[in-house]
Amino acid sequence: NFMRRLRSYTQELKPDFALIGEVLFGDYNIIVNDEMLHSCTNYECYKGLYSSFNCMNMFEIAHSLHRQFGSDQWCIYRGKHLMTFVDNHDVTRLASILTNKKHIPLAYGLLMGMPGIPCLYYGSEWAEPGEKAPDNDYALRPCFEEPKPNELTEFIKKLIRVRQGSDALCNGAYKNVVIQNHQLVFERCSEKERV
């Protein structure tokens, strides 16, 4: 009952306050609903993102995206905006987990095009490496003296601007169009536009 009380309390203080939780597995609907959290981390799609590029099997992420956000009645998170990410404070950074570093911009392109609320982990916008260790996460949480912007940073900025200007990318339905091992084409469609 704590989450329900927290949601009610925060909405009284600030109606547009968003509650986002970290949920590693299970049915996100149990905690992401009109009475509890507004959103939570989407670990299923996180795993599908890097794994699809490492195995060159776009069927994996396409399956997860359709299962979660497709238009079929059985799709489980239609209309929800889960927090999507390519890395965070608990997992090996994208620059360290991808076997082909040329796929880093592609992974960000997919992140910004898929349903959800894209979240960037500090330092990853310039491809900072960092591997999760069995006994600590220090490599995932470095202290930077200053930012290290590069071409990837500029590319991600462009993707963010495109997403911000697109109702379909922010709120639209999801539909797989073409799925091959090395290619994934999907459609995002809202009442205002189709991408």
Description of each model-found segment:
Residues M36-H38, K80-H81, H89, A139, ...:
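Sequence-level motif detector for i,i+2 pairs with an aromatic at +2
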